[in-house]
Design a protein with these regions (language model features):
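Cysteine-centered motifs
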Residues: 2-3
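C-terminal motif of bacterial Sec signal peptides marking the signal peptidase cleavage site
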Residues: 6-9
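Early extracytoplasmic/lumenal segment of secretory-pathway proteins
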Residues: 14-90
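Short, well-ordered beta-to-alpha junction loops that form the rim of enzyme active sites
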Residues: 26, 81, 140, 174-175, ...
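Extracytoplasmic ligand-binding site segments that recognize negatively charged/polar headgroups
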Residues: 29-32, 88-235, 240
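Conserved glycosyltransferase catalytic-site signature
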Residues: 60, 81, 229-230, 248
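Paired acidic/hydrophobic, glycine-rich loop segments that form the ligand-binding mouth/hinge
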Residues: 74-79, 225-226, 242-247
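A ligand-binding cleft/hinge motif common to bilobed small-molecule-binding domains
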Residues: 83-86, 243-253
């Protein structure tokens, strides 16, 4: 996931727009104390007052729709890398202003590996690293309650389709994660034989691949207790679900 500098041409008739910082982010990504203290820090750096407008989203596609169709003029947003690629392609981003006042420019310290991965989403004559700064990265996998599930059972994605887990599984309400889970499971043998890669599967949007993923998701449906983007952490800690296909950051919450 990456933070992105973003600014549209919309204005504000009642307040000077340059004195407002509009942020659109995932829940729990910025400590509330940081948001409260930032205007004072900004004034120390620049001598200018600043007000923050902070909004959160829980699904990448909803965030993109609000910006693209709602013409929301956020300054900073924090989508996943595949959404960055779409935003660049749609000309929704502006280059990052690297004038950080008295604070050093830390962007060159980004890991070369992460920078390389980020720039794989670049567009002709546009390097993604000029528009986005990596915020965090992680993996998706199976979080399980060991009161009900053994580590051995959780060691294979078969567990998501096992009928003994009927109504006990939470899945991420994310198109990319749901599609990826289904299509990877459907091609488990080919992956084991190294005749196809995960990247190839994730980028296969052919009618045949979509139909196969749909079939696998329908087979999984009886086991699903709900589709979540944020509440899975709490449900798992309260023993209301046995298994959560989730992001690594949520898993360590």
């Amino acid at each position: 996931l990456c933070c992105i500098a973003f600014l549209s041409s919309c204005g504000n008739s009642t307040e000077e727009r340059s004195r407002v910082l509009k942020i659109y982010n995932w829940a729990d990504y910025i400590d509330e104390d940081v948001l409260a203290e930032f205007p004072d820090w900004y004034k120390q750096q620049t001598g200018e007052d600043l007000r923050i407008i902070y909004q959160v989203f829980d699904i990448n596609e909803i965030m993109l729709t609000k910006i693209e169709r709602g013409h929301e003029d956020f300054d900073v947003v924090c989508p996943s890398e595949y959404i960055i690629e779409r935003m660049l392609r749609k000309d929704l981003l502006l280059p990052i202003d690297r004038n950080f006042g008295h604070t050093p420019d830390y962007i060159p310290n980004v890991s070369p590996y992460i920078r390389h991965e980020l720039n794989r989403t670049s567009q002709p004559e546009r390097q993604t690293e000029d528009y986005a700064v990596p915020y965090m990265w992680g993996t998706a996998g199976i979080l399980f309650n060991k009161k009900f599930i053994t580590a051995e059972e959780a060691g294979t994605w078969d567990i998501l389709w096992d009928s003994k887990n009927r109504g006990k599984i939470l899945m991420k309400d994310s198109y990319r994660d749901a599609y990826g889970t289904a299509i990877i499971y459907a091609h488990a043998r080919e992956l084991a034989d190294s005749t196809v890669t995960v990247e190839q599967l994730m980028n296969d949007n052919s009618p045949q691949a979509i139909a196969l993923a749909e079939q696998r998701l329908k087979e999984m449906k009886p086991n699903i207790a709900g589709w979540e983007a944020d509440f899975g952490k709490e449900m798992m800690t309260k023993n209301k679900a046995w298994i959560n296909f989730t992001w690594s950051g949520d898993a360590v919450w």
